[in-house]
Amino acid sequence: MTKARFESIGAYIPNKRVSTEELTANMNIPPQFDLEAITGIKTRSWKEDKDDSYTMAIDAANSCLENSKYEAADLDIIISCSIARFVGDCSYYEPPMSLFLKHKLGAHKAIFFDVSNACAGMFSGLYILESMIKAGVVKNGLVVSGEYISTIAETAVLEAKDIYDPQFGSLTVGDAGAAVILDKAVDDNDVIDCFNLISTPEYSDLAIGKPSNDSNRYAMYASNSKMHTEERLKIWPNFQIDMLAKEGKDFKSEQFDYIIHHQVGSKFVERLLKVGKEAFSAEQPESLNVLEKYGNTSSTSHFIVLYEYLKANKLKDKSKILMVPAASGFVTGFLSMSINNLAVK
């Protein structure tokens, strides 16, 4: 059976950093909480004047191509997956961001479309592309996101009142671009082993991005206390248990080396590790994180983690990695993959 693999990965991380101390010092209402202690985020990556969704996606895509055997002209498809779609000061929905990227990169034969699924956007794009490769519809493709999302943090600085404010979670975000090229796996050392997503729309109203209720700014309103209950967090391990059981497998037998959770904050990751340990009755793999430096970069967060660890040569050979999305919607699931030759130059 045909399987897909991560052929290459790339990223663009702005050089600018905004510290948690700096961010909260600018709040209209002096905070009665220690955001850094709550989230574990010391700084977050922040767009520079030259950056927008488009430029960050282009830079991430070029980074990915530099690490790839493919050139842009070889790409069969481009899927753009960002939440924000800024080109300059304008937010574009038509024409799609993927068309801008196709022309700029020179991917002249590539079909193209956009997918938006909150912080699970890149997972959704990869899920579609993996299915297309397995079905023989395309041979390869680029999934990319330029996530300029700090606009909601700027709104929260002006409007959030306390830890219970629905805009509180917006204070964790940072900006970054990420890109992945998938193609057909040639062996079991580099392969997507198992990939499934689940959406639970009954919880879709717990996090909504929209214009602010109090200004003309972009904002996100999230009920974190309801989103992060144990009942919600257990959706992931229970789903993975069911999917693995259908293949006659369990978590222990998968022998994961590393796990990457959504970079919302350190306490959130710790809770998911605890829930996973209890649900699977198994110790959790080593947890990879870069949230202390970059914050929650939304749809790019898992892939920024993977990119940074590859760049620093911190992963052992023939690693097996589990990625667990967590997004508004409520979307979760798991991507299990083996990597050996995936590298960042």
Language model segments and positions:
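Claisen-condensing/thiolase-fold acyl-transfer catalytic domains that form or cleave C-C bonds
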Residues: 54, 58, 84-94, 108, ...
